Amino acid sequence: MFKVFKKEIAGRVLEVEVGKLAQLSNGSCLLKYGQTAVLVNACASKSPREGIDFFPLSVDYEEKMYAAGKIPGGFIKREGRPSENAILTSRLIDRPIRPLFPDGYRNDVQIIATVLSVDIDCTPDIVAMLGSSIALSISDIPFQGPTASVHVGLVDGKLLINPTSDEREHSSLDLVVSGTKDAVMMIEAGANEVTEAQMLEAILFAHEEIKNIISFIEEIAAEVGKEKQEVVTLEINEDFETEVRAYAKTRISEAIRTVEKLERNAKIELANEETINYFYEKYQEELNLKQIHTILDSILKEETRNLILYDKKRPDDRQHDEIRPISCEVDLLPKTHGSGLFTRGQTQVLSIVTLGAIGDVQILDGLGKEESKRYMHHYNFPPYSVGETKMLRSPGRREIGHGALAERALEPMIPSQDDFPYAIRVVSEVLASNGSSSQASVCGSTLSLLDAGVPLKDMVAGIAMGLVKEGDAVAILSDIQGMEDHLGDMDFKVAGTAKGITAIQMDIKIKGIDEPILKDALEQARVGRLYILDKMKEAISSPRPELSPYAPRMLKMKIHPDKIREVIGSGGKTINKIIEDTGVKIDIENDGTIFIAAQTQEAGELALSIINNIVREPEIGDIFKGKVIKLMNFGAFVEILPGKEGLVHISNLAHERVNKVEDVLAVGDEIDVKVIEIDQQGKVSLSRKALLPKDNDKKQDDPQKA
């Protein structure tokens, strides 16, 4: 049955069509917002996947180039691997809905959001996030939503829901919030040093709109929703669970209290092994390994959370707001342009900066208008960082997401192209990880950029906050380690300067958090961030005054846009000759700005001089050393600048009469000439005799008398 539902959001109508497209999916809907259209499908397998202890949810956000009226580039001319934006949007869709499936649900669930049409004023990511919630809510998949999502901007002190393209350009906040009616589930933000109070206000502002949208989704589900499937979960024998807990609880509790990670893991593993062996000897083949592993995992989680909530201690013996020991180093790698090593507890990140020509920027050819990215951050998480072995492959979604978060944190502090005309790439290599590696890469990036001499507007640091919540008992944790992330209820990453926040990412494993927890977490993160910044300043507190000797030297000049073709030359002949002769890189912008990247200052200045000569307009009185390129019976044509020539009339060759031009000059001769006239067509008249002394003229120029 085909139905259309409509609701106005931020002055534009959201239209939801159900029952027309993709009717074999468990749940399907077409959303139209402005001229943006996204088709979202949700499907689930008929039975649980065997032998897994996680929920197999996959989310794919498909960018179709036809949605923007484009044909894909490349030889194949069809969509290939998902873009970085598509991967980040897939993660945005995934994160708020994942906690809202029943515990123990092991059926494969797949969400596919296909962008069919794009309106730059109505971003398709938010539409896809809403569509995923609607598709799940109307399906028979056991989803405990709905959720809703909005984009929030801050323009001239005013908060805006789902800002337009122009408003986003002028916004000091780029915030995405997802939540249920009761609480916030997910936050993703980039900002230009907004305060904690402003950020909290924006999040709560978003949640009010989310509540309205959820009421709309509930109406849709009530009218066209299917009956939900029954969830098949593993049943635990209560008597057996009591027996296992009595044997293993004390052993696991003692193991958890081991401060060092590897030793703690070994003791937990030993406690589990002893428990399994004990019950295997008792029950032999009747022992259900799946049940005992599930019970042991629940004991580990409960004992860890009890330690934090009621003993007010953490597994590594820290206080709730205590940050692990920090060390910072710079200038570790002699041939790189800048490097920084940030170590926090057992998490260690080495960040390396490379400075390049403006032409090295990354071109982002997506569904919106073509853009470029001058500052790039790439995050690598090799298996050895957690003491494991694994095949090395291209970066996964997690690595791309963490890299984008650290990039967003630093981007507002990167100097403008006018102030620092370089493309900047930072690579963060995670050498060891026990939690908060993405925020360690924020700190490492700051250290390495300052070491490279990049004039950051301010230093940026990041911290990962955690949460453990049971009823009214709440513990907010600063600088969480891996175990606290895995067994806790929240991963709340906050990065910023001493003045304010530049990036936030929050994921919740429970059904949301309320305003008091958000407020306390933001304030505790601010205190921690300031502490980390002070530690970083002990290693380096300002950019180095000089760039690395191995970094390219950048020179900048401005020419009239009409002169660009002269610098490039026919088929690029002129510019390629300059590059070949000097070894520089040259980038020319449409407004006539030219950037020259050279390995040495001398090479850059030579290229600059050549370009100056190309675009220089001769004026009356200018003196040049020119080259004779053509002889005529009435005079000689002399090249005075690259691509520019003038005529020395035979009467201006010498003070004495010259019968034949060939008597005085030959093609290829280099002579000094003076500009004596420029006519209305721009033709240049030159004089040689104006620069010759009369006394010596005959001796120098009359071959018959010489």
UniProtKB/Swiss-Prot annotation:
Signal peptide: none
Transferase as UniProt keyword: yes
GO molecular function: 3'-5'-RNA exonuclease activity; magnesium ion binding; polyribonucleotide nucleotidyltransferase activity; RNA binding
Compartments where located: Cytoplasm
Sorted UniProt keywords: Cytoplasm, Magnesium, Metal-binding, Nucleotidyltransferase, RNA-binding, Transferase
Biological-process GO terms, alphabetical: mRNA catabolic process; RNA processing
S1 motif domain segment(s): 621-689
InterPro entries registered for this protein in UniProt: ExoRNase_PH_dom1, ExoRNase_PH_dom2, ExoRNase_PH_dom2_sf, KH_dom, KH_dom_type_1, KH_dom_type_1_sf, NA-bd_OB-fold, PNPase
Reaction(s) this enzyme catalyzes, per UniProt: RNA(n+1) + phosphate = RNA(n) + a ribonucleoside 5'-diphosphate
Keyword Cytoplasm on entry: yes
A Pfam family per the record: RNase_PH
Purpose of the protein: Involved in mRNA degradation. Catalyzes the phosphorolysis of single-stranded polyribonucleotides processively in the 3'- to 5'-direction.
Similarity remark: Belongs to the polyribonucleotide nucleotidyltransferase family.
HAMAP family: PNPase
Protein name: Polyribonucleotide nucleotidyltransferase
Organism, as annotated: Alkaliphilus oremlandii (strain OhILAs)
Lineage: Bacteria, Bacillati, Bacillota, Clostridia, Peptostreptococcales
